[in-house]
Amino acid sequence: MPDAQDKLTLLKNRLGIAWRDEGLLTRALTHSSFTYENRQNGLENNQRLEFLGDAVLELAVSDYLYRSKPEMDEGDLTKLRASVVCEPSLARVARELELGTCLYMGKGEERSGGRDRPSILADAFEALLGAVYLDQGLEKAAGLAIKYLAPLIGDVLEGRLERDYKTELQELVQQRGGEQVQYVILKEEGPDHHKSFTAGVLYRGVLVGQGTGRSKKEAEQQAAKKALMKSDLGSACNHKK
């Protein structure tokens, strides 16, 4: 069975990138639980790279959809993009790349199944894109994103991927003459490397759904799902102030 270094080598070969600074790749694969358990070493986790990669991802997919789907209007493009860059899609790509096996992760997080947790995998893929952007530039990072995400577009259009409840909820509200919904984090529990979030979705200041998850994105999706299940949501949307 390959050890951690062998797995990292396999990942490098899979990516086909001649890294100028391999430290960026290491940082992209470093989960906050690892730096928490080894904080005396002054290591940096992948959260800042994740922030950067998120922006790269949105631009790359937006550009690709704009060029490849000329028949779609702005609303359809936005909905499709949201489904492509959502957590389940990114986690699926991360599994294809076997990022979970390469992560530097704390022992506690690993014991709790962190290597296959969708939120962690999705964040790692975004961090990887951030690292590639800094090391190789936007064109290379965007190319990597599209290489793995473009095949999922057909799956999204044919309903083979998990639903994006946040987009569905906003569309429902807008179709019925409503306003934007708002998401708030109601509660955070646990240490930084092992948090649980509770999110609420508000419509005109009223809490219409609540959900929990291991990431803010997951919690918000669950809150939107709960809101969509409410039979009285439609009448609330139709009620004008």
Curated annotation (Swiss-Prot):
Q: Quickly give the catalysed reaction.
A: Endonucleolytic cleavage to 5'-phosphomonoester
Q: Which GO terms describe its molecular function?
A: double-stranded RNA binding; metal ion binding; ribonuclease III activity; rRNA binding
* Cofactors demanded by this protein: Mg(2+)
Q: What is its EC number?
A: 3.1.26.3
Residue ranges of region Disordered?
214-241
* Domain (RNase III): residue spans on this chain: 8-137
Q: Is Metal-binding given among the entry's keywords?
A: yes
Binding residues for Mg(2+): 50, 123, 126
Example GO biological process: tRNA processing
EC main class here is: hydrolase
Q: What is its main location?
A: cytoplasm
Recite the UniProt keywords alphabetically.
Answer: Cytoplasm, Endonuclease, Hydrolase, Magnesium, Metal-binding, mRNA processing, Nuclease, RNA-binding, rRNA processing, rRNA-binding, tRNA processing
Q: What does this protein do?
A: Digests double-stranded RNA. Involved in the processing of primary rRNA transcript to yield the immediate precursors to the large and small rRNAs (23S and 16S). Processes some mRNAs, and tRNAs when they are encoded in the rRNA operon. Processes pre-crRNA and tracrRNA of type II CRISPR loci if present in the organism.
- Record-given protein name: Ribonuclease 3
Q: What is the lineage of its organism?
A: Bacteria, Bacillati, Bacillota, Clostridia, Eubacteriales
